[in-house]
């Protein structure tokens, strides 16, 4: 991925939020995969090291705050003032192996409508000064089996995050 090892691109960008913690990142590796003809609009994993445990905790708090606002407002307003709608779904059957609930933010949401409609699975996991993210966006939504498959991938990423 172009610039996948730089700090130029944001790590946290859910719901177009403001994440001041981005300036506390000291290392980053993001990898994206694409396949022509695939319904996956975006598939990426990322690992970030923050300047401190406190900085990583601040990032998680910012993410939770933006998520709560996006859920309550059912989306966010773009620069023109138009609402970009989000319809959040509940993730069930969280597998063993992911980080504890207090150290993760898992998102399952439909974004926008019409030709811009897409579904996001975002798995944000924190451990100490490290963060790992798995982002899967599909233009055709996800079956329960697909969600379960990506949750297993999140568990694998969590095991690597733990060292």
Which residues are covered by each model-predicted region?
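A small/polar (G/S/T-enriched), proline-flanked helix-loop surface module common
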Residues: 1-119, 153
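Short, solvent-exposed coil/turn segments at beta-strand boundaries
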Residues: 99, 124-131
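Glycine-rich loops and low-complexity Gly/Arg-rich segments
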Residues: 69-74, 131-134, 158-160
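Residue-level signal for secondary-structure boundary sites
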Residues: 53-55, 132, 142
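Mobile, glycine-rich extracellular loop/lid and propeptide segments
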Residues: 118-127, 137, 147
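Short, well-ordered beta-strand elements
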Residues: 43-46, 129-139
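Surface-exposed amphipathic alpha-helical segments
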Residues: 135-163
């Amino acid at each position: 991925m172009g610039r996948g090892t730089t700090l130029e691109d944001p790590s946290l960008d859910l719901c177009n939020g403001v994440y001041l913690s981005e300036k506390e990142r000291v290392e980053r590796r993001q990898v994206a995969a694409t396949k022509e003809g695939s319904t996956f609009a975006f598939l990426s994993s990322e690992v970030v090291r923050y300047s401190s445990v406190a900085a990583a905790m601040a990032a998680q708090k910012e993410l939770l705050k933006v998520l709560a606002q996006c859920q309550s407002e059912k989306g966010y307003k773009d620069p023109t003032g138009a609402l970009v709608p989000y319809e959040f779904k509940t993730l069930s059957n969280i597998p063993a192996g992911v980080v504890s609930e207090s150290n993760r933010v898992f998102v399952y949401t439909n974004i926008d409508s019409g030709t811009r409609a897409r579904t996001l699975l975002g798995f944000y996991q924190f451990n100490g000064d490290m963060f790992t993210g798995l982002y899967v966006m599909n233009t055709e939504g996800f079956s329960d089996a697909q969600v379960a498959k990506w949750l297993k991938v999140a568990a694998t990423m969590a095991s690597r995050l733990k060292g």
